[in-house]
Amino acid sequence: MTAPAILVLGTADTKADEISFLRECLTAGGAKAAIMDVGVLGEAPLAVDFSRHDVARAAGTTNAAIAALGDENLAMAKTAEGAAALALELCQSGRCDGLIALGGTMATDLALDVTSALPLGLPKVVLSTVAFSPLLPPERL
């Protein structure tokens, strides 16, 4: 049996420890974990398979242009666009058997956009530090 390829999506600049722990758990369980950094401003202090620059490129822009938008919501929406395009490409090419996203309010919102763009039936898990936020309407959850 081939090891499942799990895409781990998170803001590596703020959740590096959590992402590293999740990668270790997945690898120990026999899966291949690929990390996609969906952060905008900070550099990832860990090795990632898909950088924030790769994500921006998948959205047809650059990370610098996203950061220059000057609006967190616009930046996260553009990042979500790139992350969704890249994740979908990985799924369609057989390089993603499931996705686990983790983060706080903004990363959870972004993860919901990404997971909704992926095929029905693909396992998707969102781990969030928030159970409720006025920034995330209940119908999004």
Language-model-derived ranges and their functions:
Residues 2-42, 98, 108-117, 121-128:
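N-terminal phosphate-binding or glycine-rich loops at protein starts, especially the Walker A/P-loop
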Residues 18-21, 45-48, 137:
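Short, glycine/acidic-enriched capping/hinge loops at junctions between secondary-structure elements
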Residues 37-40, 64-68, 130-132:
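Short C-terminal domain-edge/linker segments immediately following a structured domain
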Residues 46-95:
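Phosphate/nucleotide-donor binding subsite
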Residues 75-78, 82-84, 93-102, 106-141:
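Active-site histidine-anchored catalytic micro-motif
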